[in-house]
């Protein structure tokens, strides 16, 4: 597979979701990444990823069955990149 040209956080799918969703991201180079979930008030409710990832495309599965229905924000951050995607949990 070709190496991505830039950092990217894709739209989570499915969205809206019930209990489980998939978060995909790509990196053009090896980097330390964090992906965290925040509620509508900005409070961190889950840390999904914290580690070193090689360049390429990656997937993270999130099971939110213990959280309430509502709007959440997926935030991906590295030394070179920050992006946030909105997601709706519907039970």
Language model regions located:
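C-terminal outer-membrane/trafficking sorting elements
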Residues: 2-13, 17-91
């Amino acid at each position: 597979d070709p190496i991505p040209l830039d950092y990217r956080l894709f739209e989570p799918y499915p969205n809206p979701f019930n209990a489980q969703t998939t978060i995909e991201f790509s990196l053009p180079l090896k980097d330390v990444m964090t992906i965290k979930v925040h509620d509508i008030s900005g409070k961190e409710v889950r840390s999904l990823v914290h580690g070193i990832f090689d360049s390429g495309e990656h997937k993270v599965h999130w099971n939110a069955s213990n959280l309430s229905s509502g709007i959440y924000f997926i935030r991906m951050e590295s030394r070179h990149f920050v992006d946030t995607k909105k997601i709706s949990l519907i039970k």
